[in-house]
Amino acid sequence: MKEVINCFKENNPLFNKPLKEVSVEEGMEIAKELFEILNERKDGIGLAANQVGIDAQVAVINVREPIILINPKYVETGDEIPYYEGCLSLPGKAVHTKRYNSVVIKTAQDDSNWYFSGAPNPTDGQTGWEKQERNKNDQELRLLETVCIQHEIDHLNGLNIMDRQVISTITNKKIGRNEKVTITDGQETKELKWKKAESLVESGVWKIV
């Protein structure tokens, strides 16, 4: 079984180049292998072919359900939001990025477009505490899935989180020290001023949502 190439230790010539398009049949075979690698590692939610040394426009994701991307293309994008993300190919590294809160994509294996959105539903949080919690958790998962889609498509186009990095400190006024941000560790969500949230986010455990 192939392994994810650690780009801090090994050269991966495919990491920074657009990958070639493949047939649906070949893409499905590659996707099967990628899922096996991802499931074996148990520390990631998405994987692109070039991360294991395969030159093919194929990636897989498993957040809410397994998703296969073969030759994916953007059809439509939503509003940009701040995010904080890492990468299996750059272990221990996480950076602030800007991502779309919704995307519509087209893949080679599907006739219809796919819509992914992490934006709140109009009825989210309107009735009952338990419903609010369910809606909040569902929104966080939908947003994570939407960001992961973009992360993997970046890989297929020769981009990575370092290409998407934005500096989120008071020095460049991306986020003011007294500006409130929402952060999550996957279990709990908090709304804090950036001056209190910054150290939590930089620890890598918490991320901006």
Model-derived features: where do they sit?
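Positively charged
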Residues: 1-179, 191, 198-203, 209
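Extracytoplasmic/periplasm-facing segments of secreted or lipoprotein envelope proteins
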Residues: 188
